[in-house]
Amino acid sequence: MSALRSLASDLSDPTTKAAANEIAFKHFSDGIKSTKLSFPYKVDESTAILLEKEGVLTNPFSTTLHTHAAEKMLENRTLNEVGKKLKVHTGPFTFIQFKTGKLGHVGRGHNQGDQIINYAREAKDLSRFETLDTAVVPPVHNRVALLHDTLHFLSPRQLAQLFHHNPNLHLLYATLVLPVEALHNLPSLNPHAYTLEYFSNGDFAYMPGGHAGSGYYHSAETLHWLRAGQIKLGHFSLSLNKEDSFGAHHIFTVTRQFIPPAPRYLYAETELVTLHDIFYPADSNVQRPYPATLINRMELYCRSVKAVSLRDIFAKFRQVTETAQLRHMRISDVIRLANYFLFSASLSGTNDYPSLVGHGLFKKMRVSFQERVKEVLAPLVGHTQYRTLMSFVQPKPFTFSLTPVTFHAAQGRKWSNPLGPMDPPPPGPAGPDEPSDPLIGPTLSLLALGIPDDDLDADLDKIAKRNTRKDELLAELTQTPTKVEVPPAPEDAAGPQNPTTTTPTAADPPTTPADEPTPEAPKHHPTLTAVDIQLLNDLRFTDLDIQHGIDGPILPLHRNPAELTPTLIADINCAPFVEMLSARHIPIISRPVNNARAHALASDVKNAKIGKLLTKQPQDWLKSWDARCSTSELQLNVAVIHGAGGSGKSYSIQETLRNKRETLEHTTIVTPTVELRNDWSGKIPRMAPDRIKTYEKAMLQPGTATVILDDYGKLPPGYLDSYAVLHPNVELFILTGDHRQTTYHVSDPEANTFHLTSEIQEFRPLCAYYINATHRQPRRLANVLGTHSSKTSGGAVLEADMIPDDATVLVPSRVEQAKLIDLNRRAMTYAGCQGLTAKNVTIVLDRDTPLCTDETMYTALSRASESITFVNTYSKEPGFLAKLDCAPYLKTMLTGVHEEEYQPDDTPANDNPTEPELTKTHLPVENDNVFFEPLVEQCTDKDTRELFTAEHGKTNLAQTSSLEVQLFPHQQAKDDALMTETMKARITTSTRDANLRELHDTNALSGLLFEFYADFMKVPKDPMPFNPTLWAESRARAERTYLSKTAAQILNGANRQDPDFPDNFVALFLKSQWVKKLEKVGMQFKAGQTISSFKQQVVLLTTTLALYLRACRNSHQPDNVFIMCEKTSNQFNDFVKDWNFERDNYTSDYTQYDKSQDGLFLNFELRKARHFGVPQAVLDAYTAIKTDAKVFADTLKIMRLSGEGPTFDANTECNIAYDAARFQLSDVKACYAGDDLARDRNCPERASWKYISHQFTLQAKPLVTRKPDFCGWSLTKHGIVKNPKQLWQSMQLGLKLDKLKDIVPSYSLDFHHAYALGDKVYDIFTEEEMAYHQATVRLMHKMGVHPKIAGDHLPVFHITSDRLLKETKPIPALVPTISITPPATPPPEAEVELTTFTTHIPDSRPIRNVHFD
C-alpha cells in the first residue's frame, strides 16, 4: 500500500473523515464532470478497467448507450491528446474530415475562427478516388491542421498532393485507426473495443464494439501506414512520426521538413511468443504466436507426467484455455502445438555435460577439449537429446514494434509504383490570405462534391439563442434592485397599501400562458398598482373587483417593503427558470448556508429524533453529514414564491417544465408528502418519476442544477441548508409555500430543531410578494378565510351525521386518520392535507378540533373546491360547540348549516331452492360403555374440584354418587358458596360519578366504533327519522310476550311490578343449570352465571327499544351477515350452504363478555340508537339505568346484565362492532349471536388496531380453524350439525337423571341435521365423532325416535334477557285489563303521549323525569 493510501486508511476521527470525504467528493465530482463531454457512455466494469489503462475515465452512473461505446471513447481520447498538442501552437487551425460537434474534444470553440474542410461525406469514401481534386474545394489556410481518422483511407500520393496543393500547410496531425495485430492475422488485442474478421485475399474487416453495422473494410496495404516514416514524390518529401497510440487509434505528425523518425514504432505490449521450427516441411510447424504463460504451463505439465500422451496434452490444453478464446484458435495449429509438446517431452531433460567438480587442471583441460570437438562435429553427427532440447525449449519473443520505412508515392491508388512526374498545383478559387468562415467551409466543400451537409451540429443555433437570452436576463437583473414588501397576514392588510415597485419596461411586456385566451381589460382594484394588476393577470386573475372578508376588504396581493438585491446565475441549465422568475418579478437572492440550522437537523437525524429513512443510514454517513454541516461555506441561490392554496404558485413552474423539455433532465422536485408527489407526477407526466421525490429520499439521492421545494413549510427546520451541504452542485432553489398554513411540527422537545423557526419563517423575508388569491375555492368559502377568489359558483356548507363513503375526510389527529384508513376511507389530518385539492371535503369535528391552531384550521378549510361537509362525531352539547368558537374560520363556516334526511329502501329476500333427499346409510355398532372412561380417569375427586369460600364453605356442584354425573357441574340457585364466587367473578361495583366519567372518556372512540359497524353492516349514511308506528308495534309485541307467561310466573314477579320498586334496582340470582360444554366436562369447577331482574316497567321500555332497533337493523342488514335471532335452524343451514371451507375460518370467544360491556359499548349503543331516531328521552332513561344500577352491595359498574331488554341484541351488535373495528371484514360471510361469531375467512387485522386496542377491556380468544362452531352447531360443507360428542354426553346425562323423555324431543330436532346427511357424514366427522354419532343414533332408535322434520322450530335464546318466550297459554283474566291498541295514524314525535315514571336513587332524589309511550 502506498504512503498516502496507508495514511488515509488510518483516519478514524469522524470530523477528519468528513473532511477527507469532502475532498474525495470534490475529486469525484470533478471526475464525473470531466466525463460529460468526451466519455459520457455506459460500459461494463471490465471494459472500464481496460479503458482506464488508456487514460479514459468512465462515469459509473451513466445511462447513455452507444453501439461501440469503448471505441468511441478511445476516439475521443485521441482527440483530447491532439487538443493538448494543438495548445502549443497559435491558432486558428484547419480540421479536415471533421464534424463541428467534435470541436470540444480538441479544446476548440465554435467562435475561434477554425476552418473545417470535408472532402467527402465519410472518410472511407476517399479510398474510391484516385486523387484529391482540390481545385473545387477551399484550400487549407492555416499552418497547422488535423486530418481526422482519414489517413488509413488515403494513399501516399493523396497525402503528398494535400501538402503540394496547400503550400501554407506545414504541420499535419493525422489520426488513423488500424489494428497492429492485423499484420499477423491475430485476434483483436482489445475485444472490448473492436473485433476483426480476416478474408482469404489478406483484407480484413474492422468492427467497433463487434457491431458490423459500424464496421470498415480495409485492404491489406492500408496497414503499411503503421510503419510509414517518410514519403517521397520526386524531390518532394514528407516526414512522418508516430506520436501516441490508444488501442487501434494512432496519432502521426506529418511535416514538410525532414525529421529523422524513431528507430522503431512501439504499438502494444504483449506476452506472445513464437516457437522454433522443429519439423520438416516448414508448414508442419506451429504457425501462430501463443502466450508465454500458456507455453510454459504446457511444457511443465508435459515434463511432470511420467509418460505423457497426445490425448493428455489435448485435455490439458482444453483445461487451461478459456472457452471464449477457443473461437480464435485454429484446430490445425493446435494439433501442431500438441505435437511440438509431445516431441519436447520425448527428449531427455537430464544434463549430459561432464561435471568439473572435484577434477584437477589436466582433467578440466581434457574435458574442455573434448567438448569443443563435439561442438565442431555436431552439425555433422547431431546433438544429444539434452542439447537438442535446450536449443528450442526457450521460445522466441514476439513483438508488435515496427521499423519505419520510406514510401515512394506512386500514381493513383497503388503503393509500389516507381517515382513519377508531379504535376504543378492548379490555381485555387481563393488566395491563401482570403478569410474562411468555419461554418461555410464544409458546406462549400460538400456542395462541390454534390453531398448534402449532414455533419453540421443542429444544436448550435439553439445554444447561441439560449446564451443570448441568458445575457439579456442577467443584464436586466443588474439594472436596479427590486423593492418589495414582506407579505403581512390578510387580517393585517385591510387598509390600502402603497408599495414601492419598479415599473416594468417596454422590453419586458407581460405574458400570458400560451393555452389561455387573451384576457379582457380588467377592472382595476383601487389599491393595486399597474405592476400588481399585470402580475395577477398573468396568474389568470382578471376580476379584481373588491371582495370583502370577515375583517373588511381583501387585497389580492401583498408586497414585501424590504429591499431585495437579486443575484446572477450563469448556469445555462437554469436559464428557463431564470427567465420565468424574471417575468414574474421574483428575484433570486443569494444567501450563505446557515450552519447552525443545518447542523441542528443533521444532529437530530443522527440521534434518531427526526425522520425514518435517514435515521437508518450508516452512522459513518450521518457523522460525516453532521461534520460537513458545521463547516460548509456554500452560498444558496433562492427564489421564494408565497401564495394561498390555488393561487398558481406552481403554475409557471409547471408550464416551464411542460414547454421546455430540456429542463426536465436538470430539475428535481422535492415534496413533503407522498400525496403531493403524486399530484406533481400527474401534472408533469413526462418528467421521470425519480426526479420527483419525497424529502428524505431526495436527501440521499443526487441533486440537479435546479431544485424545486414545493410546500417547503412542511419540511423540517434546517432542511434547505442541510440539503445544500449534501448537494453543492445545485445552482438554484425555488421555494413555494404559504406562511398562513401549517408547518412541520417537531414533537420531541429534546431535539435541536425544536427551538428553530420553521423553514417558511426563515425564508419569508426573501419573498417578493404574497398572492392572496385563489382559483380553487368559491367566494363563499374563500372570502371567509380572507382570500380573494376568482370562482363565483359553488361553496355549499353541509352537515352530516355519518362520514360519506367516497369523501375526502380530514380529521384532527393521526390516530383518527389511521382508524378511518382501515375503513377504506381517504383520510388525512388537518395539517397533513396541505397541498391537496378536492371538490368535496368532509371535515370531522371531535374533541381535538378546538386544540388546533388557526394555521391548521386554515389549511383544512382551504382544501375544498366545491363544498365542505362537517361531521360532528363528538358531542352536540353547548359546551363543546362553544369551544369551537376558538376557531374563527370554523365558527363562520358553520353558519347556516342544515341537515338532510334519507329514508332507506326495503328489499325483500329471495327464496332459496330446496335440497333433494339423501340416501340412507348404515353405521357399525360402537361400544358406548367406554366413552366416559377417559374423562373419569383424568377427573380429580369431588372435594378437590369444589370451590371453597370462608363464609359458606365449599360449593355443591358435583351431584349424586355416579362418577359420570359428577363430570357435569350442577349450578343451583340455593348454593350460597357458588353465589359468593359468582359475585366475585361476574360483578364489579363502582360509583355513578365514575360511570359517568367513563362514559364521557369513551365518547370519541364509540363514534369510530359505530363507523366500523356501519361500514360492515351497510347502515344508511343519513340519520333515520323516528318511526312512531314501528315503536308502537314494538311496545305491543313486548307486552304481548310478557302476557304470554303463566300465572305463576307473573305472580312470582309481583314485587317487581310494584310502583314503589326502585327503577334502578337490580335483583341478582344465581342461574340454575347443568353445564354441558365439552371444555368444562370433567374439569375444575368455576363460577356460575347470574340472573338480574329489573323493574317490570323498565324491562318493557328496554325490550321495546331492543325490538325497535332490531327492526331497523333488519332493514339494512347485508346478505353476507346472519344473526341467529328469530331464525330457524333450516334458515341457518341454508346460509351455511355458500360458506367457503377451502380456506381458514375464524371463530372467537370472549373473556367475561358481559363484564366487559363497559362505557365504550354503552356509548356505541346510544350512538346507534340516535342514528335510528330513538327519542332522546328514551336514551337518557337508558343511560340513567346503566350508569346508576343498584344491587344489594353497591352501584354496579357499567356492564351487561341478563335482565335488560336489549341484552341479546346489544351483545350481538357490540360483537359485530368489535369484530369490524379489529379486522378488515369487507364482504366476508359471517354469523353472529350474542358473544358467539364465526366467519368463513381469517381476515387481516387493521393497522389502526394497535392504536386503539388498549382502550378496550373486552378481550377476544380467537381461533383459526377449518371446522368452525357456532351456537352449538358445527359448520360443514354439507350444512350444520350438532357436535355428536356433546349431544351424546347431554343425552347420557338426561338418561342417568331419568329425564330423557323430557329432553329427547328437542334433542331429536338438533340430531336430525346430521342424521339426514346419510353417507355424507363420512366427509365431515372424524373417527371419534363417527363413534359418538352412531351411539346417538342407536340410543334414539332404542327409544323409538325416528326424526323426519327438523329445523323449523325457533331457538329459545333469541330473547334470553327477559325470558318472555315460553310455549304456554296466557292468563285469560289478565288479558282484558290492558289495552294494546296502537293508534291508526300515529302523531308526530313531539305529540306522542308518554307515561311518566321517576328513577330513584337511595337518597330519594329523582335523577330526572323520563317519558315513555
From Swiss-Prot:
Residues 772-905 form the (+)RNA virus helicase C-terminal domain. Belongs to the potexviruses/carlaviruses RNA replication protein family. It catalyses: ATP + H2O = ADP + phosphate + H(+); RNA(n) + a ribonucleoside 5'-triphosphate = RNA(n+1) + diphosphate. InterPro entries: (+)RNA_virus_helicase_core_dom (IPR027351), Alphavirus-like_MT_dom (IPR002588), DNA/RNA_pol_sf (IPR043502), P-loop_NTPase (IPR027417), RNA-dep_RNA_pol_alsuvir (IPR001788), RNA-dir_pol_PSvirus (IPR007094). It comes from Botrytis virus X (isolate Botrytis cinerea/New Zealand/Howitt/2006). Signal peptide: none annotated. This is RNA replication protein. It comes from the Viruses. Residues 614-771 form the (+)RNA virus helicase ATP-binding domain. RNA replication. The central part of this protein possibly functions as an ATP-binding helicase. Residues 413-444, 472-525 are annotated as: Disordered. One of its GO terms (biological process) is DNA-templated transcription. Residues 499-515 have a biased composition (Low complexity).
